[in-house]
From Swiss-Prot:
Domain remarks in the Swiss-Prot or TrEMBL record: The Q motif is unique to and characteristic of the DEAD box family of RNA helicases and controls ATP binding and hydrolysis.
Disordered: region residues: 1-109, 547-591
Stretches assigned to the Helicase ATP-binding domain: 196-371
Name of this protein: DEAD-box ATP-dependent RNA helicase 30
Length: 591
């Protein structure tokens, strides 16, 4: 799209490019024919195009999505959850599965056969919306190189656009810019500055950035622009944007952001995940939503039962692709992508760049841009002060109490415990000792997990204990400190755990209780500390010397979790209900 092409200047010129299969339509007065979310006539099978609601400012002049008169209900998640550690029905050997009501096992999912789609005679759709603002145009090559160097941005691809220094450079609609301003952001994060122009140009994109880097808005705001330029949903149409996420926690958080910005843009969204009743999710899909955020297993359930389809999807996001492969979701991802038109725009996001993710990207993406923030190797955030303490297992709890007395001032503290049983035990004892602690793990019902997260986010219960279910994708602001009560099974999980603090440029602190049983991780842990500019305690160095070759053996390299492997577990094994969050506080309030 050339810089002089003003294709968004008026509704009529937009309508003629809308890709209607039966010629162009005459301009329609929205008041003349009320919008029906279940059916829209005219304009071919997809219904008429959105009509601009006023003269939007900005160089791109994006057409505003026209919501139905009288409003609509926003997608919502369900209540009671199932069992298992993760938010999908991913059991049967790789990771403990979270079944929920009406779910299937992972083995059953692998046997599901979705209908083969016919992608002949595809209707054209618009996906290039980017015009450089004068500020970006004025940047010299030296300016661009300096900006990227200062923010540790590296790029690959053909005709890579310059980064955006200010939110106004993206020329998002005014309502989106107002929402950004209310959140108090002063400038785009590095992944947003480079990712927005790439996404708005309509090209496929690979984004490599650590959690907490602002990547959700890096793909979500261009998605809203994309939706606004497409014809309205017609009867039985599926979504225009599909966002796949590995866990229900991450999916719910993406939905919160989508709802926050989508309401201002008149774009509907819903969240589809396991461990919650299907009824409300099915109603949202049948009502019609432009954006679906989903975990792979529950989405395949919905596709198999024909509660929705992906024929209208032209903007696909794979969030935390490395995590989805870790959890064994590759077969489900492939089945889902096979239902989507091949000329879609695809955005793949990952914290690391292992060979499996690279292979997936090579098969699913065409001529992509690549934006890397920092390194493709998993590294600890340098803004986090890491403190490693050698603590014998029997002394862990007393050491935790000492830390809490030093740290607790009402700020949020996240404590990671390796097992669900251990998580409940620590939480129960903390509450009996008067500390405001709540636990979250896979044996908690979905409604209880939602309640615990809400209490923790609001600060009403500033101490939360968790298993690794919360280690990836959990977006809680202002976590002062992370405590690794138990060292995790992989160094990858260690980095993701401590990454819950020190987000968005803030400083953070992480305490880790390290035992002699964890000695195999000592050598690589020292490397992580050194790479992040942290002090290596003499006791840890001594443990490395005493443990011989250390973790990784003679093969060399950092040994992270093998793809598709991991902890065993069943699916939907209905254990006795976890009651640690209901233990009364004992004694006096301790802070």
């Amino acid at each position: 799209m050339s810089s002089y092409d003003r294709r968004f200047a008026d509704p009529n010129s937009y309508r003629q490019r809308s890709g209607a299969p039966v010629g162009s339509s005459q301009p329609m007065d929205p008041s003349a024919a009320p919008y029906n979310p279940r059916y829209t006539g005219g304009g071919g099978g997809y219904g008429p195009s959105p009509v601009m609601a006023g003269d939007n400012s900005g160089y791109n002049r994006y057409p505003s999505f026209q919501p139905p008169s009288g409003g609509f209900s926003v997608g919502r998640g369900g209540g009671r959850g199932g069992y298992g550690q993760y938010g999908d029905r991913n059991g049967g050997g790789n990771w403990g599965g979270g079944g929920g009501r009406g779910g299937s096992s992972k083995r059953e999912l692998d046997s599901v056969s979705l209908p083969k789609q016919n992608f002949g005679n595809l209707v054209h759709f618009e996906k290039n919306f980017y015009v450089e603002s004068p500020t970006v145009q004025a940047m010299t090559e030296q300016d661009v190189a300096m900006y990227r160097t200062e923010r540790d941005i590296s790029v690959e691809g053909r005709d890579v656009p310059k980064p955006m220094k200010m939110f106004q450079d993206a020329n998002f609609p005014d309502n989106i810019l107002e929402a950004i301003a209310k959140l108090g952001f002063t400038e785009p994060t590095p992944i947003q500055a480079q990712g927005w122009p790439m996404a708005l140009k309509g090209r496929d994109l690979i984004g490599i950035a650590e959690t907490g880097s602002g990547k959700t808005l890096a793909y979500l705001l261009p998605a809203l622009v994309h939706v606004s330029a497409q014809p309205r949903l017609g009867q039985d149409d599926g979504p225009i944007v599909l966002i796949l996420a590995p866990t229900r926690e991450l999916a719910v958080q993406i939905q919160e952001e989508s709802r926050k910005f989508g309401l201002r843009s008149g774009v509907r969204s819903t969240c589809i995940y396991g461990g919650a009743p299907k009824g409300p999710q099915i109603r949202d899909l049948r009502r019609g939503v432009e954006i679906v955020i989903a975990t792979p297993g529950r989405l395949i359930d919905m596709l198999e039962c024909q509660h929705t389809n992906l024929k209208r999807v032209t903007y696909l996001v794979l969030d935390e692709a490395d995590r989805m492969l870790d959890m064994g979701f590759e077969p489900q991802i492939r089945k889902i992508v096979s239902q989507i038109r091949p000329d879609r725009q695809t955005l793949l996001w990952s914290a690391t760049w292992p060979r499996e993710v690279e292979t997936l990207a090579r098969q699913f993406l065409r001529d992509p841009y690549k934006a890397i923030i920092g390194s493709t190797d998993l590294k600890a955030n340098q803004s986090i002060n890491q403190v490693i303490e050698i603590v014998p297992t029997p002394e862990k709890y007393n050491r935790l109490l000492t830390l809490l007395k030093q740290l607790m001032d009402g700020s949020k503290i996240l404590i990671f415990v390796e097992t669900k049983r251990g998580c409940d035990q620590v939480t129960r004892q903390l509450r009996m000792d008067g500390w405001p602690a709540l636990a979250i793990h896979g044996d908690k019902t979905q409604s209880e997990r939602d309640r615990v997260l809400a209490e923790f986010k609001s600060g009403r219960s500033p101490i939360m204990t968790a298993t690794d279910v919360a280690a990836r994708g959990l977006d809680v602001k202002d976590i002062k400190c992370v405590v690794n009560y138990d060292f995790p099974n992989t160094l990858e999980d260690y980095i993701h755990r401590i990454g819950r603090t020190g987000r968005a440029g803030a400083k953070g602190m992480a305490f880790t209780f390290f035992t002699h049983d964890n000695a195999k991780f000592a050598r690589e842990l020292v490397k992580i500390l050194q790479e992040a500019g942290q002090v290596v305690p003499p006791t840890l160095s001594a443990l490395v010397r005493s443990s011989g070759s250390g973790y990784g053996g003679s093969g060399g390299g950092r040994n992270f979790r093998p793809r598709g492997g991991g902890r065993g577990g069943g699916f939907g094994d209905k254990r006795s209900r976890s009651t640690s969050n209901f233990v009364p506080h004992g004694g006096k309030r301790t802070w």
